[in-house]
């Protein structure tokens, strides 16, 4: 009985959190066809969502980006997608880890984050990790945590905001959008935002001191969409620039330009 009530309440919360908010402003929108021309497999696509859930994530992370997905190329025997469909894999609040068409994010503000230096084999490993994750459940224990902070001025100190997104079940079969992507990159020893320890060494009395950096992997549950944006190891790809932007070809409103 208790489990039934809990499931019912969670369902109500999910429907509430996935409701769309008003006044969504598209300012960094690229057509799916244009995105596909610049995307490479294992690129991370950050999205500014238009749901209440998105507002909570953006508040807690103090970021524009509320969702992350990973580009896996054209579908081939990938879930229910027709073969040849440009596809991304994401963790969805209602459906868990799923493959969806790239066109799902048409009209949304997006950003492409590209892992620098990954070779083709490593990119394929990252993608395969995500493919193997299909069907995993979304960690709905985070739903209650996020719902609490949808009041206008949530009383959450800055130092606690990240931990609010790591209060989930701890069940490895349950994920949120950015955690599984973080694990995919960690599986090929690729850094996102590692903790850096600096060790000072001196090999002899007359030798100069040297500083060596040791990277420590952060737990995947602590990663948020924002981390791929601020990571020094991911390149920001702008489709407009990649496709040969020339400001001289723009048509301006003459009155606005002169004023």
Where do the language-model regions lie?
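Cysteine-nucleophile amide-bond enzymes
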Residues: 1-259
